[in-house]
Swiss-Prot record:
Pfam families: ThiG. GO terms for cellular component: cytoplasm. The gene is thiG. The keyword Cytoplasm applies. Its main location: cytoplasm. Belongs to the ThiG family. It is found in: Cytoplasm. It comes from Trichodesmium erythraeum (strain IMS101). This is Thiazole synthase.
Amino acid sequence: MQTVEKLTTETLEKPLIIAGKKFTSRLMTGTGKYPTIETMQQSIEASKCEIITVAVRRVQTQAPGHKGLAEAIDWQKVWMLPNTAGCQTAEDAVRVARLGREMAKLLGQEDNNFVKLEVIPDSKYLLPDPIGTLQAAEQLIKEGFAVLPYINADPLLAKRLEEAGCSTVMPLGSPIGSGQGIQNAANISIIIDNSTVPVVIDAGIGTPSEATQAMEMGADALLINSAIALAKNPPIMAKAMGMATESGRLAYLAGRIPKKSYATPSSPVTGKINTTTSE
């Protein structure tokens, strides 16, 4: 029987592997919505994440709050995950992904072919386009990208993307920035059970307890941005999310007790002290 110490050590040493690249942290974070670049830097450090997603469109612009974003992060310590946020069509997403790959190379990550694929024509609910996502993924895979697609919690689409060659699938827990938590638990569980690539739950997580819940379900990793960046104290929330992610992973590997409809005593019933008195 494994001891708690042995299980913990093995868990911490077992890496998350995406497209052949190993990561020890299972929490990914972003760069958007922070009040200042300094707060973003502190939060990234506190989270202990190793993958940071960056919107290619944000880095390309010189608008206030965007300038110097890429340079504010030490890309020797963390892996860049360029994303195609803002793209409404498959064609647009492919073009932006190509820019993202070049951007990663300019920042010193010559072998970085990662892209977080987002095709979102819906501006109100920010729900991803399944057809456009699959079309863009197929093209990007042909061009040698490691594609991490953001999708609805659709088990059939997840399998199609996996079969197309995607490096992960990234089902949403609930709409981006909503903080509604895991609203698609049944479908996400099906995706996890049937996937042979890492499943990264992306969007909707609002609290560390929800992050733990997602990892307890068997997710391989989480991508959390808004819940950290919009917290009253982002660095502290980032630390909490990092700890919650690790805690949930350990709980999943340890295995929870089965639920029962009746009580079971914690103490043994054998050897009870006779408390009755004889007359």
